[in-house]
Amino acid sequence: MNGLNNHASNIEIVLPELIEAVFVERVNRFVGMVQVAGHICPAHVPSSGRMRELLFPGNIVYISPMPKGRKTQYRIHLAKYDDIMVSVDSLLPNRLMYKVLSEGAISHFAMYEEVKKEVGYGESRFDIYLKGEAGRCFIEVKSVTLVDEGVAKFPDAPSERGSKHLSELTRAVGEGYRSAVIFIIQRDDARSFSPNSITDPVFSQTLSQAIEAGVEIYALACDVSLNTVRLKKYIPVQL
């Protein structure tokens, strides 16, 4: 699997009009300071990931104004990495995959008639639930921003929640559901995907166990521009 059909690759998330800024510092998980038009202002970071290779002092980021009354004046959407753009919004992949799956644009999942978001199962809520004559399917979508020497890696910080989701997907397979985890790499320079066993060995082990139990795993890289984010291609998974 190294390509997408034209329908899937043409579905996109349109970004708001963006302003170039300079990242100053990360205040906490969800707030960073940026310099824009000569002023230093707080900006919402839409991800709990560390993203140290993207959000560091002096790096170029792209932001949009927040509505009045919010705690932060801006929202960070993209960060520059060498000559490419990286989307840092951890919820964008969920929106993109819901849009793609709702249009039946990925052949692996085109046989389901019903597509829902945020459906509960056990002690978890999975991002997408598919239902139809083909059966029932849970999908968990993971946002990936870290790429090291061409290898996309997840997570970039220990993720107990991520391991829990994998365990629940495994349990769902045992109860007759189809289950899948889709890693969306929000940049286009990844050649393959691997779990980040050094940062989170528990997640890596849990992922291997999930695959052995029948959970499907896919990884897709994105084409990211100042205007849109869209799926670009499948990349191989290496455990």
Swiss-Prot record:
It comes from Desulforamulus reducens (strain ATCC BAA-1160 / DSM 100696 / MI-1). It comes from the Bacteria. GO terms for molecular function: DNA binding. This is Sugar fermentation stimulation protein homolog. Belongs to the SfsA family. It holds the Pfam family SfsA_N.
